[in-house]
């Protein structure tokens, strides 16, 4: 097979193109049928794009699949015409019967599709393009194409961006409970009521240093409720009183002994000074 004939068997004719259609849009669209090697939109002598072009695939099997998949879909409101290229070995075959031997797809459903792009069960692929050189219409087309071939993005927007609870709600033990009756996208927040022991731990104040030093005991009043309390003083026993009085007496005697020792020392020093004065005379 000659190279020209082989390339013609891998190429499809795309007609009835709207003036805003660019080669990048056709590349993204026909990439669903298989890997591409070249996309061309014919132009006149003045450089203006014509209403037809050619898409060359890497494999000839992708040609019949592209015709069955994309023939008749609408780009900018105009249905495109996808056929075999003139001169190929299969150009005489009807376009709606060429793909039945490979995949059973009714191309009539795609010709009547009123959407911007056709449906496909294959995952959408993209190729890197310089964003600065693309028109605004291409990004609109690519955005709509992404929503068609990605069912995850068809969920309600607020389902994926539901606000997370802040630190205050997390600390107060908030639980997320979905409302099944209202639908999958609705939800409600229910507050978990703290138990009596939690209320007691949060509301009961701690004793200060004075109350701790005076040997105070915290006794909760169960009859008044979990958040009420009273303070009771522990009375010392008889043995404790005896020890306290004994310590006081020992302290008093030690103070008196130290005072008498000081007086004796002063008297001795005075006598020593007087004896020195007498010796001088």
Swiss-Prot record:
GO terms for cellular component: nuclear speck; nucleoplasm; nucleus. It is found in: Nucleus, Nucleoplasm; Nucleus speckle. SUPFAM superfamilies: RNA-binding domain, RBD (SSF54928). One of its GO terms (biological process) is regulation of alternative mRNA splicing, via spliceosome. One of its GO terms (molecular function) is poly(U) RNA binding. Residues 187-217, 229-242 have a biased composition (Polar residues). Residues 184-281 are annotated as: Disordered. It comes from the Eukaryota. The keyword Methyltransferase does not apply. A motif (Bipartite nuclear localization signal) lies at residues 245-280. Expressed in brain, hippocampus, prefrontal cortex, cerebellum, spinal cord, testis, mammary gland, spleen and kidney. Also expressed in fetal brain. Residues 271-281 have a biased composition (Basic residues). InterPro entries: NEXT_complex_subunit, Nucleotide-bd_a/b_plait_sf, RBD_domain_sf, RBM11_RRM, RRM_dom. PROSITE patterns: RRM. Keywords: Developmental protein, Differentiation, mRNA processing, mRNA splicing, Nucleus, RNA-binding. PANTHER family: RNA BINDING MOTIF RBM PROTEIN -RELATED (PTHR13798), SPLICING REGULATOR RBM11 (PTHR13798:SF5). Tissue-specific splicing factor with potential implication in the regulation of alternative splicing during neuron and germ cell differentiation. Antagonizes SRSF1-mediated BCL-X splicing. May affect the choice of alternative 5' splice sites by binding to specific sequences in exons and antagonizing the SR protein SRSF1. Homodimer. This is Splicing regulator RBM11. It comes from Homo sapiens (Human). The gene is RBM11.
């Amino acid at each position: 097979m000659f190279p020209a004939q082989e390339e013609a068997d891998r190429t499809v004719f795309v007609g009835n193109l709207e003036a805003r259609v660019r080669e990048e849009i056709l590349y993204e669209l026909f990439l669903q049928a298989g890997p591409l090697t070249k996309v061309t939109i014919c132009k006149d002598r003045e450089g203006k794009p014509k209403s037809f072009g050619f898409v060359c695939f890497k494999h000839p099997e992708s040609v019949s699949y592209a015709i069955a998949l994309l023939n008749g879909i609408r780009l900018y409101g105009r249905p495109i015409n996808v056929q075999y290229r003139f001169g190929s070995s299969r150009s005489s075959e009807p376009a709606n019967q060429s793909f039945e031997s490979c995949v059973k797809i009714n191309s009539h459903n795609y010709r009547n599709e009123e959407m911007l792009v056709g449906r496909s069960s294959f995952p959408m692929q993209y190729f890197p393009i310089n964003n600065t050189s693309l028109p605004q219409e291409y990004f609109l087309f690519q955005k709509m194409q992404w929503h068609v071939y990605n069912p995850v993005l068809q969920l309600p927007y607020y389902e994926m961006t539901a606000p997370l609870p802040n630190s205050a709600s997390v600390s107060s033990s908030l639980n997320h409970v979905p409302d099944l009756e209202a639908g999958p996208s609705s939800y409600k927040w229910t507050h978990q009521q703290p138990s009596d022991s939690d209320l007691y731990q949060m509301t009961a104040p701690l004793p200060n240093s004075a109350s701790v030093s005076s040997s105070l005991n915290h006794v909760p009043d169960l009859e008044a409720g979990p958040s009420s309390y009273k303070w009771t003083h522990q009375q010392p026993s008889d043995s404790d009183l005896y020890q306290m009085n004994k310590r006081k007496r020992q302290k008093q005697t030690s103070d008196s002994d130290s005072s008498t020792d000081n007086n004796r020392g002063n008297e001795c020093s005075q006598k020593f000074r007087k004896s020195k004065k007498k010796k001088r005379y």
